[in-house]
Regions:
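Ser/Thr-glycine-rich phosphate-binding loops at phosphate-binding pockets of nucleotides
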Residues: 13-14, 40-43
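Alpha-helix-centered segments that form part of catalytic cores
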Residues: 112-147
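Active-site gating loops and adjacent loop-to-helix segments of metal-dependent hydrolytic enzymes
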Residues: 83-126, 170
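Generic signal for short, ordered secondary-structure residues
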Residues: 10-11, 37, 120-124
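Charged catalytic cores and adjacent phosphate/nucleic-acid-binding surfaces used
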Residues: 1-9, 17-31, 35-37, 48-91, ...
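Short coil/turn segments at secondary-structure boundaries
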Residues: 42-45, 129
Length: 262
């Protein structure tokens, strides 16, 4: 049976140096539950080590996690990459790591990069700075993601920095994203008016949470799916088999009778 599922597919943990130290697994899951979120995308910068901890804890609370990461490509464009399971995320994660410049993190400048378990015990620190661009193009990251059965979504495309439109001005012809993420500050109608080239693409919105308060967003993405899985999200983004995705104001409890695909 199909049902509506509220999602936030862009959440950072304490592994991202730009995230607040409050962004541990327990705190993230509690904030997600408080905001009615049933599907989380954990997407640290060029890294994935904290995804298993959040996924394990979220499962106990009935919240699903899409294993993912936010990759910064050679063009300095941020893209969200999601995978069917932790094993495929780990394989791609290691490939991304091999293409990350070996520049040591300076915690006093960039922030700590903390690896934790589900109970927020510190397991270690990532020493390589995660905020740099990897030596892979957009198309190469897309290809790596697709070969692993993953989902490829350019992030916050309407923002003035680290976005597809700000850095390239267009969606390159060789790029075939599953969707585009827009920031919560604009509606789908507003962003399509500003960027007519986005018409025809499926859109999602996410918090890009770097602190707990970020998870309370003005707008939210809802998927109409049979289960909180990557396969169902793929169908919803493509508008297939009755699945769909909508963006609505967070003031609305559920998108009941709204039209389907944006």
């Amino acid at each position: 049976m199909l049902r509506w599922l509220k999602a936030d597919l862009h959440v950072h943990t304490v592994l991202s140096p730009c995230a607040e130290l409050e962004m541990g697994p327990r705190a993230i899951v509690a904030a997600a539950a408080a905001n009615g979120i049933g599907l989380l995308g954990i997407t640290d910068h060029n890294a994935w080590a904290n995804v298993p901890a959040v996924a394990a804890l979220a499962a106990r609370e009935g919240i699903a996690v899409l294993p993912g990461m936010e990759v910064q490509t050679r063009e300095e464009v941020h893209v969200l990459c999601f995978f069917p399971d932790l094993a495929s995320l780990a394989v791609v994660g290691e490939e991304i790591r091999r293409h990350l410049p070996r520049i040591e993190n300076r915690p006093e400048v960039f922030g700590d990069q903390v690896i934790v378990d589900a109970e927020e015990n510190i397991l270690g620190f990532e020493n390589t700075l995660l905020l740099n661009s990897v030596e892979l193009t957009l198309e190469e990251v897309q290809d790596i993601t697709r070969r692993a059965g993953g989902l490829f979504i350019p992030a916050h495309v309407d923002r003035p920095a680290f976005s597809l439109l700000a850095n390239l001005g267009v969606v390159p012809p060789a790029l075939e994203p599953d969707a585009l993420e827009i920031s919560g500050r604009v509606t789908p109608e507003e962003v399509k008016s500003l960027f007519p080239a986005l018409t025809g693409y499926s859109l999602i919105t996410s918090s890009d949470a770097h602190r707990l308060s970020d998870l309370a967003t003005p707008r939210a993405t809802w998927f109409y799916v049979a289960a909180p899985t990557l396969a169902e999200v793929v169908l919803a983004l493509a508008g297939l088999e009755g699945r769909k995705v909508v963006i609505v104001s967070s003031l609305e409890n559920k998108p009941h009778d709204l039209p389907g695909r944006l």
